Amino acid sequence: MRILLCTVGVLLIAATPVCANQAESDVAMVKLANRSGCMTCHSVLPLPRRADGLPPVAPAWRDVALKYRDDAGASERLTRTVMTGSNPKVRHWAGRTGAIRMPPNAEAVGEADARVLVNWILVLVP
């Protein structure tokens, strides 16, 4: 029992910097998303329908992570979508979000930052 408790204690101590670093990374990513205007339409977690009965404007990032978790090309494709905007004729989120296309964000966020944000979003769900 003593060995088990010591092992668990060592593992918890070893994991603490990782958790702290992850929390710092999460805070940094949300700050970057706010500065870039992403949080105007998106949220990290799913939101309920609005008071007027309409769905949220854009998909929650957790839902994006779920949708694309097995897609090897998702990072590149979603980074391109962030930079150039979404195609208004393709309704990826029909019925779950508003019918507004995502505008190009190349002026609001650089491609390197967009890629970092997209990669962070894609690992929100293991």
For the regions a language model picked out, list residue spans one by one.
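Positively charged n-region of N-terminal signal peptides that target proteins for export
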Residues: M1-L4
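Bacterial N-terminal signal peptides
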Residues: C6-A14
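Sec/Tat signal peptide C-region and signal peptidase I cleavage site
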Residues: T16-Q22
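Sequence/structural segment immediately N-terminal to covalent heme-attachment motifs in c-type
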Residues: E24-V44
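Axial heme c-ligation environment in periplasmic c-type cytochrome domains
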Residues: T40, P46-P55, P59-Y68, M83-D113
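Post-signal/leader-peptide non-cytosolic segments of secretory proteins
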Residues: D71, R80-T81
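Hydrophobic "lid"/C-terminal helical patch
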Residues: V82, L117, I121
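Short, solvent-exposed mixed-charge patches
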Residues: V125-P126
